[in-house]
Each structure stands twice: as C-alpha cells, then as structure tokens.
Amino acid sequence: MLSESLTKTKLTDPLILDLLQNIREHRSMLEDLVSIKIDPNLTNIISNEIGRELYIENEFHKAKGFRKLHIEVAEFSKNLRILHCVFFPDPKFDIPIFGMDLVKINDIVSAAIVDLSPASQNQGLKYEKLLSQVDKSSFSSLREIPKWGGIFSNNVFFASLKRNSEKNDFCRVVDQYLSILIKLSNKAKAEVDKEIIQERIDFQKNYCVQQMKNEKTSMVLLKYFDEKWVNNYIKTVLFDF
C-alpha cells in the first residue's frame, strides 16, 4: 500500500530526523538535482497488520556527478528503526561512494556507520587525510568491520552509540563526511577515458556485491516478505549496478 511522505507523518525519532535533515540539506547542494522514478511498489511500503507493523520510505534522486542518491527510512514492528543512505557516483566522475547506516532498537543504537568508500584505484589518497582529521575520539564502543568490509576506506567509522553525547557526535561526523563529499564533487570533472570509467563501474559493482553479503539486511526483510521480493528489493532498490 502506498502512503504519503512517512517522514512527515509517522517518524518521530529525533536522531533519525536530525540525520535525515542533514543528509537532505547536503543533497540539496548538488547541481542538477532531480528525482528518479522507481517502481511505486518499491518506494513507499506500509503495513498495519498487528504484530507485523512496518513502513519503508525511499527517496531516489540523481545529480551532476551522481547516478543515484538513495535514502531509505524504515520501521519494523514499532521497535526496529533503520536509516540507510548511499550516494552512488556517476562513473564518469572521480567521486567516492557515500554510505551511512543507523540501526536503532528501541532507544539503543546498535550500529552506526558512515564512510566515503573508494570508487576507483588509489582514489582514497585524495581524501583519506581529510577523513582522518574528523574527531572520533569521544566514542566508547567501536565495532569491528565485517569480513566483506574491504570495500570501505581506511577511515570508515563503525560503532554502537551508548550515550546521548555519542549520538550528537555521530551526527557531527556524518555532517563532516558529507561536507568533504560535496567539496570533492564540486572539484570533479567528467572523464572521457573508457578504461578509467570502466574501472569505476567495476568498483561500484564490487561495492554492491560485497554489501549484499550482509545477511542482516535480508534477515530483517524475510520476516515480512517472501524471498523473491527481498532479492528483488535488495538488487533493485538498495544495491543496483
């Protein structure tokens, strides 16, 4: 069932709303920003079945330098809330992949991750120093990167957030990573060399393939949808290439 903008009507979680506003503000800074039409059955999804309540809202845009800007907000059974965001660059431009995920169970943030992941060989040399200068010293519960996490930069940030101060600091880190992304995108020029473009395409394909190894994504969705729907959603909405 389709719904109106759920983030305007149902979502009340202050942390997710703060992050969402920040991401949207940075997205609005991009040139030639336009929305992308996706199958409406995969855009806004809502169920009021008792014990299996859920809503999923997706936003899709593209802009100069970016082939897809995706934001997903989801709530499952009134206690599991997820904010997922990936900005996929246009392979013609030498821009990293921005990714951010927040998983909140009741009031506990079990996972908070943000990164600018390399989308070409040695690309990280252009921005790793900038990421390393972002202060992350206040976090007490850093988490181990999963085995498939070789796609991330050396400065990927992954933690559980225990205190309110850590939640505020995570918003700051996301803001600074996004600001670095915007600066990089403003400097990027379109490439014409087909081999270089193909290398960037291959990097994005590998990014998506590795992300799909995260079994937690499908485990949550399979509680509400059949396997065919889940596979299509993951490959079409979350990690297409």
Swiss-Prot record:
What's its catalytic activity? (2R,3Z)-phycocyanobilin + 4 oxidized [2Fe-2S]-[ferredoxin] = biliverdin IXalpha + 4 reduced [2Fe-2S]-[ferredoxin] + 4 H(+)
User: Which molecular-function annotation in GO is an example for this chain?
Assistant: phycocyanobilin:ferredoxin oxidoreductase activity
Q: What is this protein called?
A: Phycocyanobilin:ferredoxin oxidoreductase
Q: Which organism is it from?
A: Prochlorococcus marinus (strain MIT 9215)
Q: Name one Pfam family in it.
A: Fe_bilin_red
Q: Does the keyword Transit peptide apply?
A: no
Instruction: Give the record's family classification.
Output: Belongs to the HY2 family.
The record, for NCBIfam families, names: PRK02816.1
Name its GO BP terms in alphabetical order: phytochromobilin biosynthetic process
Q: Which branch of life, at top level? A: Bacteria
Q: Which HAMAP family match?
A: Ferredoxin_bilin_red
Keywords, comma-separated and alphabetical: Oxidoreductase
Keyword presence, Oxidoreductase: yes
Q: What is its EC number?
A: 1.3.7.5
Q: Give a short account of what the protein does.
A: Catalyzes the four-electron reduction of biliverdin IX-alpha (2-electron reduction at both the A and D rings); the reaction proceeds via an isolatable 2-electron intermediate, 181,182-dihydrobiliverdin.
Q: Cite the Gene3D superfamilies for this sequence.
A: 3.40.1500.20
